[in-house]
Each structure stands twice: as C-alpha cells, then as structure tokens.
Amino acid sequence: MSMERKELLDLYSDYLVASFGSTTATGLSQLMDGEVSHDQVTRFLSGTKKTAADLWCHVKPLVRQIQSDAAVLIIDDSIEEKPYTDENEIVCWHYDHAKNQQVKGINFLSALYYSQEVSLPVGFELIAKTEIYVDSKTGKQKRRSPITKNEYCKELIRQAIHNQLPFRFALFDVWFSSSDNMKFIKQQQKRDFVCPLKTNRKVALSRQDKGQGRYQRLDTLELETNVVREIYLEGVEFPLLLAKEIFTNEDGSTGIIYLVCSDTSISFDEITTNYRKRWQVECYHKSLKQNASLAKSPTQTVTTQTNHFFAALCGYIKLEQLEGTSK
C-alpha cells in the first residue's frame, strides 16, 4: 500500500466515524475543501480488494499491546441489511437467525479478540454466494456459497493461532457448535472452547454409556444448576463439562442455556463467566453498524463494498483505541 493509500484509508475511516448521514466520495471531497478529490476516493475504494491479511497487518501492533493468555477469541456473524442495493455475490439473501427469516444484505463473519477489556477484530470473511443454482422446490434461481460458514469459522481460528494469538477459550454460539468444529479446536489446534448446545443434542453420561451407544437428549437430563457434569457428546470422542445456567430475559421470563467446555478441570463459574464475554461481539456488531457508518455507503461493486467494510473495521478500531485510553 502506497503512502497515499495509507493516508486515504486513515482519512476515509475518520470520515466514517465522524459522519451522521450518507458517506460518499463527493461528501468527503467537499469536507476537505477539494484537497482530496472525488476521483481519489473512488480510486481508493476501487483498488485492490482488502482481505483478513490486510486487517491483521493493520491491527497487529495494537493486539500485541493487549494480548494475554486469559483472552478469548469470539467467532460470530452478522448481517448488514441493504434492501435497496443491487444484488451481487456479497449483497444477497441470507438467513437471519435473530429474525428467523431471509434478509438482503452483507453477511460478515468476524474473529474478535477480547483481552483486558478491549475488543479488536483480528479476522473477517464476507460470505460470497458465487454459485447460482435452481431451487428444486420453487424452480427459482438462488445463490449459495461454495464454502460453509463452519469452514470459514475454522479458518479464522486456524489463522489466529498461526498469528500467534494467545487465548484461553474460543467462544461461539449454537450455530457454530458442531461436533466437527469442536474436534478441530480441541484435537487439531490443541485449544479449548466454551459454547452452547441445542437441547436436541444427544449425550452419554459416561464413557461406558458412550461405548454402548446409550445416548439421551440434552433436555431430558436431570441437571442441577451451578454445578458441572462430565458428559460425552454424540460424535465427539473426548469428554466435555456440561453446565446448565438459568437466566432471566428482559421481559422477566426465564430461560435455560446448556454450555459445554472442553477443559474438564474448571468450575461452573469459570465456564459461565468466560462465556458471558461473548457479549462483546454483540457490542462490536452494534458499534460497527451505528458508529462506523457500515451501512451508509452507496458503493455498488463487490470491491468497493468490501473496501468500505474494511474501512469501517478500521474506524471501529480507532473508536476502541479511544475508549481504551479513556479507561
């Protein structure tokens, strides 16, 4: 990246953080009294498409200042809705688990490193649905990604470890709690995780039960709260600690979450306290969308949309730096 492009990234990410309305090349040029032209901004956004490797180069010095063995690595995805933007391989229809429906927008997957009360993105993927197929039920053309989000999840974790990031646990929600992901983290990468399970997952209460195929659904177990129990999950060879936590929702109702941890030496409080750190990724998503102008760009191509997303990440990192220095 030339000095001009570094300066433009710095300027453009400042612009995203400072803006309240739409962010455009013309708007930035006018704000700078023409010192930066519309064409310069357009060329910057249309340049080489930014990747997770570029993000790591950008954030690495900051991560090294806060990294610790007690950190957590959080994997999660979100959708930036773009209902009025022309469809392409990244602006397309995705299933939104929160809304339980299909929405049009950019589906992004992040690896967020949380250490010493600072949250920094250290990897990302924009889900690109590059394959066109015909839905057998409706006869309509649809898009799909040749790479699953679970595969991207593993790649983000693998890359974080390759980048020598120390962390105590990988954290993720129920959508990434596959047996395959668990085995990848514990057996291949030699790391530990905490994650929730769907209530229909099958578990055995001893190695002997597992060997004899005696499994039962999670929601049929009689489990006390505030204690842990060693279990064997169907499809996973190694034991896990199971913790049942009862929580109160905003509307006053109660819910139950079943958490499993691959480190069988820790307590109930350690499991639940660490998993609560996953909330940081929700704060990150909210800040990225509301404070870094993620949705306020009229960019139309995959490259300009990707580079705008990258600049929004850089804007978020600046805000996190400012918040960190004010603590």
Where are these regions (language model features)?
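Active-site-proximal, Lys/Arg-enriched surface segment
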Residues: Y12-Y15, L45, K49-G123, A128
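Alpha-helix initiation and N-capping motif
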Residues: L9, S22-A25, H38, A52, ...
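Secondary-structure boundary/capping signal
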Residues: V36-S37, S119, C283, K296
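Alpha-helix boundary/capping residues
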Residues: M32, T48, L62, Y275-R278, ...
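Gly/serine-rich nucleotide phosphate-binding loop at the start of the catalytic core
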Residues: M1-T48, A52
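Generic alpha-helix structural propensity
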Residues: T23, V36-Q40, K50, D54-H58, ...
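Single, function-defining residue in the core of a domain
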Residues: S2-R5, D14, S19, D86, ...
